[in-house]
Amino acid sequence: MCQRAMAQWGMPAQFADRIPARFADYAGLIGATDFAAIDSPATIPAPFLLAREGRIDAHYIPFDYVNAGARVVVVGISPGFAQWKNAMRAAQQGLRAGLPSAELLRAAKYTGAFSGAIRPNLVALLDSVGLQRWLAIASCATLFGTDAHLMHVTAVLRQPVFVDGKNYNGASPNMLTTPLLQAQMLDYFAAEASAIPDALYVPLGPKVSLALSWLARRGVLDEARILHGIPHPSGANAERIAYFLGRKDKHTLSSRTNGSQIDADRRALGEKMAALGIAPPR
């Protein structure tokens, strides 16, 4: 990423001269590491460490693959330790099989992506706002099959971040005011976004929404192309998902679910999709 872009986006000064990590720099290390012996973030070998600031560590993961032809980008917070280990094992297997780097990196990135209840929930949520019609496909379910070329999956903090040795959940510290996390967003996510400027961006959860708006204010993204307000598809979010999809009545919601906020989010999403030429479903 050029220094002019970094300066324009507001890269924290102490990180301005750093060169982002690339797979080629880590391929030999990945091939030689015994990942079975790594059982926690604290045991990740030191050469994978990208940055450390107080309680925060960021480590390299082979998620360099970017689907520049994607029309929709699904954005999480940060890969967790389990995803780091699975991706490393997939990359190691690809290296030993002699796969081309592009093929290897794609396999590493999508190993186990959106498994379990998350996938059908995500499909239902995306279809409910009309994304499948904007993409001119029957259902967003095909984004995990025949239409996979239309979707890119990433995280606003692409490299795994751990706080006090645990997966970072976006709550503390605040990624929008923490220099190391700001730098991680600009080093990696911003570079990906610049390669896919015309896609629609789907933030998974409110913390990611705030981060994407922070990036939009810096010129990394177009705010009009961010679909804020879609509930996180996790099974733990079942009640919010059910109400968003019209499967649960408002008067039956628990005190933990703000039905009025979900109503407002749905209206805003409908207006945003209408501006993109997609009328709300009848």
Segments and roles (model prediction):
Residues H228, N237-A238:
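Long, compositionally biased interface segments
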Residues A5, W9-L200, V208-W214, A238-E239, ...:
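A polyanion-binding, active-site-adjacent surface
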Residues P206-H228:
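Active-site-adjacent alpha-helix immediately C-terminal to a catalytic or transition-state-stabilizing loop
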